[in-house]
Amino acid sequence: MSTEVVKEAKLEEEPRQCTKKEKLGHAIGVLGHDSMYTLWSTWTTPFLTDILKLPAGFLAFLFGGARFFDAFTDISMGIIADRTRSKWGRFRPWLLRSGPLMGICLALSFFKPDIGTIGLCIFAGIMYIITGSIVFTSVDIPFWSLPAAMTSNTKERSEIVGFTTTASNTITGIIGLVMPMALAFFGEFDWHVYFFLALAVAVWGVTMYLISFKLVREHVCLLYTSPSPRDC
């Protein structure tokens, strides 16, 4: 079996150093990325227990199974993203592909169909796995891999990550502050409130993903000489 030789190459004829607009674009992306994930990861459990009233045993099985499944999806998505070849680069296309899907899944995760307890268990279980283990993973790994493809300059990469982390902490704090207040005001035991709040965050999140996709550029990519993929 031939050994893969990884070589660094330019995606464009421009210098590898990214612009301020591109750095800003990545930070804008995390405003949508982490607002959706914070809402989902923090409020899914209260929704499943207090609103859908699913059995505790089922939830324990679901959460444990999801953690086990995550181990496979994380590795698989890393390989898929790294081997992606498109006119937009390796990681940037996933903002466009999986970003809108994350918004749809977020809203559906807080939807309550009238299908009985067993039906709700099936629906909630499917949405939990799809949202957290598949769709989120398919955008999270490429998103945080982008800085390495935006520039080959180590200092610039650190600046991008630092700027984006600051934006991440800010939006996480805002969601953590606003969500309890909104639930208390509109009705914390009404599933419609959860759904429409999630829908609002989903629209915001997808918009931020699309803006980020528009602003960010990949200037560095990995070319695999064996096997021979389509050129970046």
Residues covered by each model-derived region:
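Symmetry-related core transmembrane helices of the 12-TM Major Facilitator Superfamily/SLC fold
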Residues: F195-I211
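Transmembrane alpha-helix termini and helix-breaking/packing motifs in multi-pass membrane transporters
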Residues: G173-W191
